[in-house]
């Protein structure tokens, strides 16, 4: 047994300049692991609690009382004494110890950010002690599947100060032989999109996740630019065949739901013409009307995946969406399920979705995250590994995506080092796999939840 000998947390900054927590773990046999915890802007109400310094002695340290020194203290003074001496390779024991120490359903006592930082650092320390890559430590020797990247090249919603209510417009390079070739294709689309935007007089400033954030007149206009950029790059806007590049959307509908109606508040506030001859001439939708709106988009554009198409409380909206379109399109739950096994069980029983988004900090431990992934995959769902809008140079999710053979990863656009770090890590993993066996990149086939 290799014991944990030291646990230390500190406060650092994330990609948005907000404080976050970094945890270092040391082991008796010389292992070392360090993890930085991400943070979301658009969050589900049922997520585990990210502990901030509001109304504490540290409240005035940082703008908006967003410091995390309370969580840091919880690691150094409460968690560390309890897990020092435990075996670093017994991940579930360490995680369970922290869950019991916290004693609340949503980790509000110690903070999910405190607990997750320790959980991930312990796994990294164990991998380091064994002198193996993290993805090998977590997944064993069998996983060789590289994920299809979902690149958020146009940002909206809570991730950008522009006119778009949908949060993410993504490209998925499917018709390519390797992860590197897929990333090269995405690179061409990204830069051609910038060229087309500039040519049309749009700004090319970027949002939190590195995508462009133009002030479009409609969601359709954003999708039109994506299709044009794919074609301009010499690729096929679609799902199948060589050089196919598909589109995915994260609507983040909870952010434009007022409890009764879905309202495109940002587009409405842009003082658009009521005579506009496109889908966004209507700004308010019932759940049924929004379903029909999505149907029009799916019929017109090569959209293979829609995430959080309805609000987290609108279970009937999700059920109807999945029933009508789930055979041929990926219907992803994020705010709906928040990487929580119990909520996922409900979604499975109701057939509300056919895919779950996985965010480590939504649940707060590596063990619980793996439980959610395995349950989804066992139930025939895909599990998409995801970043958060507040990120760092930490690349844990890249290793996790390969370790669990998720087949898909969401980690932003091709700008901002906090996003690029994950892609660079995946390039290294693919190279590593090819030195031992062949890394697999299967494109459209990752959607085992859809009809062929």
Curated annotation (Swiss-Prot):
Its cofactor is Mg(2+). The gene is eno. Catalyzes the reversible conversion of 2-phosphoglycerate (2-PG) into phosphoenolpyruvate (PEP). It is essential for the degradation of carbohydrates via glycolysis. It is found in: Cytoplasm; Secreted; Cell surface. Its EC number is 4.2.1.11. It comes from Mesomycoplasma hyopneumoniae (strain 7448). The lineage of its organism: Bacteria, Bacillati, Mycoplasmatota, Mycoplasmoidales, Metamycoplasmataceae. GO terms for biological process: glycolytic process. The keyword Metal-binding applies. CDD domains: enolase. The keyword Ligase does not apply. Pathway: Carbohydrate degradation; glycolysis; pyruvate from D-glyceraldehyde 3-phosphate: step 4/5. One of its GO terms (cellular component) is phosphopyruvate hydratase complex. This is Enolase. Mg(2+) binds at residues 250, 307, 334. InterPro entries: Enolase (IPR000941), Enolase-like_C_sf (IPR036849), Enolase-like_N (IPR029017), Enolase_C (IPR020810), Enolase_CS (IPR020809), Enolase_N (IPR020811). Keywords: Cytoplasm, Glycolysis, Lyase, Magnesium, Metal-binding, Secreted. Belongs to the enolase family. It catalyses: (2R)-2-phosphoglycerate = phosphoenolpyruvate + H2O. (2R)-2-phosphoglycerate binds at residues 167, 359, 388-389, 410. It comes from the Bacteria. Pfam families: Enolase_C, Enolase_N. The active site is at residues 209, 359. Binds a second Mg(2+) ion via substrate during catalysis. PANTHER family: ENOLASE (PTHR11902:SF1). One of its GO terms (molecular function) is magnesium ion binding.
